[in-house]
Structure formats: C-alpha cells, structure tokens
Amino acid sequence: LPIHRFIAANNANDIFYEYLQTGKVDLILANFTVTDERAEEVDFALPYMNVALGVVSPDSNVIKSLDNWNSKDQMIVISGTTAETYLTQNYPDIPLQKYDSYATAKSAMENGGVAWANDNTEVIAFASQNPAYTVGIPSLGSQDTIAPAVSKGNETLLNAINDEIKALGKENFFHADYEATLVDTYGTDYEDSLVVEGGETSAQ
C-alpha cells in the first residue's frame, strides 16, 4: 500500500469524518476507537490495538473508583471522545470539564486537574511521562479496539488494508513495532493486552 503523503489531523471525530468524506485523505490512522456510531460514518478495517478507558490523577489524590465522586470536582475529558460518551451515559452526576484537544486537556491536568478520563493508552502514557501522576483506574467500561478507517463504501482500499494487516500478523509485525516504538511510552507490562496481531481479537 504505497502512501504518497501524510496529513496531520486534530484528534476529533468531525475532522476525521470531514477529511474522509471530502477526499482530503483516503485513510485515517489515529487514536480512533471503533464504535457503532462511528461505523455509520466510516468503514473500519481490522483492528491493530485494544483500548479501554482509563483515569489518571495526581499522586496526592489517586482516584481508584468513580463511586462516591465529589460533586464539586470535575473530570477532564476531550469533547467527542468515547470517554465523554461513557461518562455522560454511566456517570451523569460527574461534572465534565471538556476540552477540544489532547494538548489543552493535558495542560488542564498539569494545572491542578482532579482527574482525566481518556483512552487508557493516553493516560498510561501521560503517567509514565509525568511521575507525579498515577493511573488509578487502568480499565473502565468495555474493551474496544482502534482500527484504520476509510470513507464509507471504499471496499477496494478497505480490502487491501485488511489483507495487509493479516499478512503483517504472520510476521508478528505489530508486536515487533510496539517493542521498537512504544515500550518507552507504555512499558512491557501492557504489550500483550494492547497489541492486536493480524486483526484477530475477541473485542471485535
């Protein structure tokens, strides 16, 4: 699959949809969780990563449960993410402090935020890079997957990507890639729980 050009995109659903639907890009490779709602807008290929939600908080007040949440505290989330949806549906009494990007949410956490709910990959990485924080809840809600996305109905590209993912799985490519690029970010303890090899996962 020759890639001619990479285009940076903010991690926001509407941007992903727009870029695919207008033909600005043919393929989205991002921290884009597969959901039924999103599958109405795009076609997802086979997954390459497992993901759940997680919650990170300061070491001075590690949040290990969302039960008995202090109603005066706000949970940081990024607008349009599965974290926002999950908390709105399952913990409607938790006030949400919403931001439009990872950078602004990260800044809010670093500047006195009580807790931040996001994909567990994101909060694990944040805590590993910021020693004063702990992932008190490493898995919240159901386990989902992250997968490439193409515009709705682009079966030719979708099939080509799926074939490539299956072929790479036979080489153990995704584990090797994790070890080469992500161990410093997530650590070895999370490798087998995060990596999906050859598109095969029970979370599909």
Residue map of PLM features:
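Flexible hinge/capping segments at coil-to-helix
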Residues: 48, 57-74
